[in-house]
Amino acid sequence: MTTKEKIIITSLELFAQKGYDGVSVREIAAKVGVQASALYKHFSNKDEILNGVVSATSEKIKESYQVNQIPEAVKNKDEITQSYEAFSTRQLCDLTWNIFQLFTKDPMVSNFRKLLMREQFENKHIAKLYDDFFVEGAVNNFAKIFQQFSADGFFKPVDSRMIALHFYAPIQLLFQKYDCEPECESQIKELLYQHIELFGKNFSAKN
């Protein structure tokens, strides 16, 4: 691991624990085990470190989507609907659970999510990041996919944004439940699977 990568990972851990404003560059440097002057060779200030965290986490999410063969990450746009149609309900549930675990268990992605949740009320820039990653941005991304599903006859001709809200809102709630009660993982997994099954029954054009 390079010094720059250590700075990013350590900074994210500290930000998630203490809040963005509660961590100094000097503290980050000490935790990494370098002088502050060495840290400044990679990042000129704390805002640049945050930008590095965002870029690194975005890349981690992208790589995880590719590893899990998420269709929108590995297929052409005109192949996405067909790819999802080929999945069984169980496969869709397993796929969704894998991504749920990415956002709740992966150290980098989980800390990033917690950082944005924690700091959204204190920092407008971080509030915008939270909205882009986990609220409006997520809903918009799902809406685009579901709009294509409806256009291709896979889903019922329902407003795609409403479909996205029906899909994503329960998952956001389960994120919160996991953060509060990680010991209830098996129950959360069962709820997630039930949600995916019911969602498919409600919006599939075959039903």
Segment roles from a protein language model:
Residues Q66-D106, A164-F167:
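Hydrophobic alpha-helical connector segments
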Residues T96-I99, R113-M117, F167, I171, ...:
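Short alpha-helical scaffolding segments that buttress acidic/His motifs in well-ordered protein cores
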Residues E5, I9, K114:
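Short alpha-helical elements of helix-turn-helix
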